[in-house]
Regions:
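Mature catalytic core of soluble alpha/beta enzymes
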Residues: 2, 7-249
């Protein structure tokens, strides 16, 4: 009857009101998300530097982004001064210069990477060997004067490729290369380690969204400001202007 009809009208009115309220909430939520993304975009900071023989770029979303990127670059420079094979006063350069002569003191960072490199040599059955440096140098890769060494040159250098002759003393915090002419090069893992260190630093400084690109070593913090994952293009080695795929991180 009439009472049932009135109850139905009240119910319909409540349902419609709920729809409008929910719709309004949804719209406001979307607006709030857009405003948040815009605010984060305004806090976007970018920087490019050259270190460890490669170009490095940072994209950081944080109100103190400029200072954070300065701190990140200082950390990179600190590690470069320890691990570089080309800087004459680096710990690695000093270790190489004293091969077959004496042990040299090293920092915790350098000791950790030397230990890791020795472990990787064992895990890969010698496929990764930091003592390959004299052979790499013979090809001219480190001096931009590429040439093909003779078999006699390579045969003379191969005895220096000897991971077991890298002697580490954690007690004394020293490293020693047992054969004169030996040299180590941590280039295969140093930038990855540096990327991890920079990522840790940025997180400690409150960064929740960033992309760190150290040559071919890429690290991401959180997602992009709009909530989507970072997309990394994998370069086509046969055509550097093209890519073979995308990886979401």
């Amino acid at each position: 009857g009439e009472e049932t009809y009135m109850n139905w009208k009240k119910t319909a009115a409540l349902v419609l009101a709920s729809v409008f309220i929910l719709g309004g909430c949804s719209e406001k939520r979307e607006q709030a998300q857009q405003m948040l993304a815009q605010a984060k975009e305004e806090n976007r900071h970018e920087a490019t530097t050259f270190a460890m023989d490669t170009i490095m770029t940072f994209t950081v979303y944080h109100e103190d982004g400029e200072q954070i990127m300065t701190d990140a670059e200082q950390e990179i420079r600190r590690l470069e001064r320890l691990l570089s094979v080309t800087m004459e006063d680096s710990e690695i350069a000093q270790l190489n210069a004293n091969a077959g002569k004496q042990a040299v003191p090293v920092s915790e960072d350098t000791m950790y990477l030397l230990k890791t490199a020795k472990e990787m040599d064992e895990l890969t059955n010698g496929c990764y060997d930091m003592t390959i440096s004299p052979v790499v140098k013979a090809w001219g890769f480190t001096e931009e004067e590429h040439h093909v060494p003779t078999q006699a040159e390579l045969d003379a250098l191969m005895p220096l490729v000897d991971n077991d002759s890298v002697i580490l003393s954690e007690e004394d915090q020293t490293a020693y290369l047992a054969k004169e002419g030996m040299a180590v090069d941590l280039g295969g893992i140093a930038k990855g380690y540096t990327s991890d260190a920079v990522t840790k630093l940025m997180k400690e400084e409150g960064v929740e969204s960033a992309l760190i690109w150290l040559g071919g070593n890429i690290s991401a913090i959180g997602n992009k400001p709009d909530g989507n994952p970072w997309k990394i293009a994998v370069e086509n080695p046969l055509n550097t202007e093209d890519y073979v795929g995308l990886v979401e991180v």
